Amino acid sequence: VDQRLEGHEDDGVTTILCLGDDPFSLDQGEGGLAEQIAAKTGATVYNGAFTGTTMAAQYESYNDGYILDAFSFSYVADALASGDFDLMKQAATYSYDEAFPRTTAMLEGLDMNAIDIVCIMYDGSDYINKRPCDDPNAPESIITYTGALREGINAMQAAYPHIRFVVMSHTFCHTINEEGNFENGDRVDLGNGTLSHYLQKELDAASDCGASFIDNFYGSINEDNYLDYMTDYIHLNDAGRELLARRFTDISFLFIFLYLN
């Protein structure tokens, strides 16, 4: 038996918590990504994603002028690990998105002991918003893409050792230049590397944390097929969400099912 499961009582139900941004938070209906994962796996799935957020925070310490940081990955993960949602609840009252207070309340009410899997997916928003990819001198810096991932997973893992983590990478996307034209996210470096650089660093960070990793960049939606799966420069259509849900199910769920049983 895995030591991380020691002392943990299995309730017989596989329960998944999805964290991230638009791939999970937009279009939460039958065609939604979390809903399709639930349909394909038979698991109970909770959707704790926030639209328009990023993995990395913008500021090193919280700034009331930028409430989205309170819903970036490390802040959400720390709230789940500590049970202290005060900052998220306060910030949610200033959000124009009515889903923010609702999702925050759902997360606060979750029994994390019942969660078996945390699935994390952010699209290319960190790249587009020029969030630093990593800081070799501060591997858990929350203002970097990989630092926030490490800090957040480590915080939740320390609080709930039984939880298994799955990191789903971003897909292909474009950035939009000053003239309003699309530019290939894997050819244009906005200052912190191209999309494939972010992918490799995310893989390294996931490996550091013992998380499973699913490559959606080379493995799912790329520059050759994105027109079939995306509505614009970054957002997925129903077919795109179905493809990612199928990839999650095919790759990780079988391994995790064996791990949990």
Regions found by a protein language model. Give the residues of each.
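Conserved SGNH/GDSL esterase-like catalytic core that processes O-acyl groups on lipids
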Residues: 17, 23-135
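Generic structural signal for well-ordered alpha-helices
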Residues: 149-154, 199
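Acidic, glycine-anchored loop motifs typical of Ca2+
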Residues: 11-13
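Active-site segments of SGNH/GDSL-like serine hydrolases
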Residues: 119-131, 153-195
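Proline-centered loop/turn at the N-terminus of a beta-strand
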Residues: 44, 163-166, 212
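Second-shell loop/turn segments in exported
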Residues: 22-26, 132-143, 188-192, 229-235, ...
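Catalytic His-Asp segment of secreted/periplasmic serine-dependent ester chemistry enzymes
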Residues: 64, 170-261
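Sec-exported extracytoplasmic/periplasmic mature domains
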Residues: 28, 38, 42, 123, ...
